[in-house]
């Protein structure tokens, strides 16, 4: 049956990621049918939980309360990727990935922030309203599937860097604070966004700070509630230097691993990761002996084993 979850739609991303990364041991057609049903039919329930509250408004006007709308856009993008990869359905893929662009309906050029609108006339709400357990600064970057467009929207890479830098003044935001929350899921992917603006050293710097300041080897050492194992998963991804950034897309953005050598025992052959250590950033990367052109690694290049060699440099203090 359709599975309810926190914010109701993250399971769609999990299913799409599972398929993209090679998982096939499930009923693909049934999964897709339920994914579509929850995304297209208002009032669909699962386990007494409405799958997408406010879906009628999202469908007819392209908006919903801001944090909910951003959750829906990521889910739509994941469904679109699943439609393309698993079902070979280009029409559905185009529909859902285009609908994922609803995040643009939240952008207010007068403030350069995302914010909610009133349903009746589309006028702007208070910029600090409708953010679930966080603030507009935390949620702003929750468009992982369309980062180039988001960056261009606010004026380009320099403007994006200034906004990112201002977010990372602290790492321990509570629900009402306007800086980074290492202990809250909407912020998990933000350190790697520096890779999209050609600042991998800053990616390394922020992740190093999070390791030192937010995670501790104590019984209460996580920075927040480990919802569904999310904090632990973040720590593992960051430690091996591979982060699954884009919903439904088989690939990883990179940071310096925390270990000099890592061996992953994949089904066909091992994947070795070398060049890591504490407090480093990535200057360049070789994938299976060939220099990589970006801070992104396609899963297809390493899924059958191989090697990743990180060329790293010590962070400047």
What spans do the regions from the language model cover?
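Short, small-residue-biased leader/transition segments that mark boundaries at the very start
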Residues: 2-9
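Active-site core of glycosidic bond-cleaving carbohydrate-active enzymes
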Residues: 9-12, 19-270, 295, 300-309
């Amino acid at each position: 049956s359709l599975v309810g979850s926190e914010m109701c739609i993250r399971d769609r991303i999990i299913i799409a990621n599972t398929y993209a990364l090679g998982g096939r041991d499930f009923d693909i057609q049934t999964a897709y049918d339920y994914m579509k049903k929850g995304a297209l039919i208002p009032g669909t329930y699962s386990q007494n939980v409405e799958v997408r509250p406010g879906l009628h408004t999202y469908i007819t006007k392209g908006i919903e309360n801001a944090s909910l709308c951003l959750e829906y856009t990521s889910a739509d993008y994941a469904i679109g990727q699943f439609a393309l990869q698993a079902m070979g359905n280009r029409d559905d893929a185009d529909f859902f990935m285009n609908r994922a662009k609803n995040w643009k309906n939240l952008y207010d050029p007068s403030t350069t922030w995302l914010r909610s609108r009133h349903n009746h006339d589309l006028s702007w709400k208070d910029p600090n309203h409708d953010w679930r357990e966080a603030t507009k600064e935390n949620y702003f970057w929750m468009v992982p599937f369309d980062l180039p467009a988001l960056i261009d929207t606010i004026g380009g890479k320099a403007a994006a860097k200034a906004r990112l830098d201002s977010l990372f003044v602290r790492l321990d935001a509570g629900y009402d604070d306007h800086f980074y929350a290492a202990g809250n899921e909407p912020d998990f992917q933000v350190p790697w966004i520096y890779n999209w603006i050609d600042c991998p050293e800053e990616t390394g710097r922020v992740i190093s700070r999070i390791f030192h300041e937010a995670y501790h080897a104590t019984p209460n050492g996580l920075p927040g509630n480990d919802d569904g194992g999310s904090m632990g998963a973040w720590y593992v991804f960051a430690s091996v230097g591979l982060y699954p950034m884009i919903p439904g897309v088989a690939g990883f953005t990179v940071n310096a691993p925390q270990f000099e050598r890592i061996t992953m025992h994949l089904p066909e052959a091992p994947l070795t990761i070398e060049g890591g250590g504490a407090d480093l950033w990535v200057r360049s990367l070789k994938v299976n002996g060939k220099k990589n052109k970006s801070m992104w690694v396609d899963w297809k290049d390493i899924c059958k084993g191989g090697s990743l060699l990180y060329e790293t440099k010590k962070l400047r203090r």
